[in-house]
């Protein structure tokens, strides 16, 4: 899977699908029939509160296992699919974003939220930023191995740069870590990159403090970035590039 360019997250999801199939029958998946595999998928779909995206990833994982690992075509038939509901994100206004950021008293997390909103970053992209990714001379941030394993550059605004420098001076430079200076900007207690779970938890707390009732997690800041840029007259293709979407179709589906 690594040779095919699959991310570690995708690999884990695919492997988990095979493990679940094994545990369901308590038998080697290589010896299961086509009918048994379909029965497992139907059981999963009807007996578990599983998200459509998770279920469909399970199908892709099993197809990969049988077709590319075992070299069998037994899953070439149509498998039961779970239709993904088309839900539009609940967009935050610029004033709501400002309230959330102001409610975040911890400078590390406030800096993270400013970056996610200001550059349209995915949470994992912000969490894994390194010093070498920040180019103050060109006012850009290098996003390495984003979703789909693709690099891209995003805009580093003066406000973002100022906030980053303040955070580095007051917090990051004093942090106790054995890491090299070129490593992660935002570190957790272990000295590794801060976890996306902790970012999500602080965001929920800040949103509550700000009195924001709209649904959605920290990814809403990225959605707000794209929507506000479009409303300000930014070109759709430019937004697509900044977001790192593989196709402009994805951008249109959410923001047009």
Predicted regions and their residues:
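Conserved catalytic core of the tyrosine transesterase superfamily
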Residues: 1-256
């Amino acid at each position: 899977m690594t040779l095919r360019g699959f991310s570690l997250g995708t690999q884990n999801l695919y492997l988990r699908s095979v493990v679940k199939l094994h545990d369901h029958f308590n038998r080697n998946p290589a010896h299961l029939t086509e009918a048994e595999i379909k029965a497992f998928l139907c059981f999963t779909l009807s007996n578990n509160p599983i998200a459509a995206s998770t279920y469909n990833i399970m199908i892709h994982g099993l197809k990969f296992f049988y077709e590319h690992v075992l070299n069998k075509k037994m899953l070439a038939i149509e498998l039961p699919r779970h239709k993904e509901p088309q839900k539009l994100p609940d967009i935050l206004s610029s004033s709501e974003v400002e309230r959330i950021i102001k409610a975040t008293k911890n400078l590390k997390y406030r800096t993270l939220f400013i970056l996610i909103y200001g550059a349209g970053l995915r949470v994992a992209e912000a969490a894994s930023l390194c010093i070498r990714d920040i180019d103050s001379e060109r006012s850009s941030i290098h996003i390495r191995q984003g979703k789909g394993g693709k690099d891209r550059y995003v805009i580093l605004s003066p406000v973002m740069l100022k906030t980053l420098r303040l955070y580095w001076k007051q917090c990051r430079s004093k942090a106790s870590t054995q890491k090299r200076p070129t490593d992660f900007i935002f570190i957790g207690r272990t000295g590794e990159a801060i976890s996306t779970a902790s970012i999500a938890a602080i965001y929920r707390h800040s949103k509550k403090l700000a009195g924001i009732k709209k649904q959605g997690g920290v990814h809403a800041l990225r959605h707000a970035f794209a929507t506000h840029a479009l409303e300000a007259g930014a070109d759709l293709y430019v937004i697509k590039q900044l977001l790192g979407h593989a196709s402009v179709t994805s951008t249109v589906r959410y923001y047009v």
